């Protein structure tokens, strides 16, 4: 099977809520078992060819689209879902910008910064973490932004499900990126 650069399919529930990134093979299985409700995207991501049906003299062909919604109930309750945090997703949420000086930096020059320091019970959560450059993080030290006289230039927030799928930063096809971006909440930093 020939794999293209963009080899993952965005799996949705029937309402169009992102559920997972799945492989071409996994997506083809959904197509073959008729569990796909609808598809989207600018044409197939891949066309997979199988064996020949002797009775009909035809080869089996499965078109796998980059976005596919499956029949059945959603496995994800949106109100229970808090996206997993990673350093890179945090930096992308904050647009690689220090929350204290407002400068943009390369990933290697950024740190995850606890607004409320860990020593004071500050947790590793979306609402307590911001992106900081090494200099500002060192200057703020083990203090709150108020104590350090370093007010936050932007507020932390929990990314929506659509934002989270963009923040994962896979090599997303342009049509899939646009589909997700068109569903971002109003005021999203990612739009």
Regions inferred by a protein language model and the residue ranges of each:
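Histidine-centered nuclease catalytic patch
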Residues: 103-131, 140-156
